[in-house]
């Protein structure tokens, strides 16, 4: 910000991996890491699939859009320890090619398809693979929602509803006790 201060009775921290740094400023450490996921779009292809595609090994996932292009996502192999600032990090032929090889291994018909664009971003992942949607008892008025491991877009409507219920002191529409932050507390 421009140095301005804002106050509220309730604060929601939902900043992906950066949530870890924000909550650390008030003594809360959410054990999580990040990894860089990439996506690509091919030129239009003849119709092949009406379903979402993916592999058990998570080599890639994606679908064919109605107009014919394929949209795929895959891990880049870049992890949190990658020695690059977020401003420097870009998708490139070295990382995108690994995803392309995985896709062609399953769908050889796409071997000659041209890639028209790529993009990527960091995904946040709690160490147990389960997101945190929780009030933080140690900091009254603090609610955290993070660690969605790339599933944020799919779950956002339900998570938004539950966060609004939490802010208003209501019971959530589903039991989210398994998503509480305190599961990371030491039992000693």
Model-inferred region functions:
Residues 1-3, 57:
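Glycine-centered tight beta-turn/hairpin loop motif at sheet-sheet or coil-to-beta transitions
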Residues 3-4, 68:
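Detector for glycine-centered tight turns/loop "hinges" at secondary-structure junctions
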Residues 4-49:
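Central helical "cap/lid" subdomain
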Residues 16-17, 88, 157:
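Alpha-helix N-cap/helix-start capping motif
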Residues 22-24, 82, 154-155:
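Short glycine-/acidic-enriched loop or helix-start segments at secondary-structure transitions
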Residues 44-141:
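Active-site lid/adjacent beta-loop-alpha segment flanking the redox-cofactor pocket in flavoenzymes
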Residues 101-188:
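C-terminal catalytic lobe of FAD-dependent flavoproteins
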């Amino acid at each position: 910000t421009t140095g301005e201060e804002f106050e509220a009775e309730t604060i929601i921290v939902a900043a992906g991996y950066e949530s870890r740094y924000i909550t650390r400023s008030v003594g809360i450490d959410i054990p999580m890491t990040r990894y860089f996921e990439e996506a690509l779009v091919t030129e239009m292809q003849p119709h092949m699939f009406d379903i979402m595609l993916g592999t058990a090994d998570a080599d890639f996932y994606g679908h064919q859009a109605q107009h014919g292009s394929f949209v795929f996502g895959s891990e880049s192999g870049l992890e949190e320890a990658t020695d690059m600032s977020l401003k420097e990090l870009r998708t490139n032929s070295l990382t995108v090619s690994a995803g392309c090889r995985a896709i062609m291994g399953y769908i050889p018909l796409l071997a000659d398809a041209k890639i028209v664009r790529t993009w990527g971003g960091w995904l946040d992942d709690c160490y147990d693979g389960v997101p945190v949607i929780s009030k933080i008892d140690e900091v009254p008025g603090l609610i955290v929602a993070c660690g969605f491991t790339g599933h944020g877009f799919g779950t956002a409507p339900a998570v938004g509803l539950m966060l609004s219920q939490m802010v208003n002191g209501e019971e959530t529409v589903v039991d989210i006790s398994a998503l509480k932050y305190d599961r990371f507390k030491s039992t000693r």
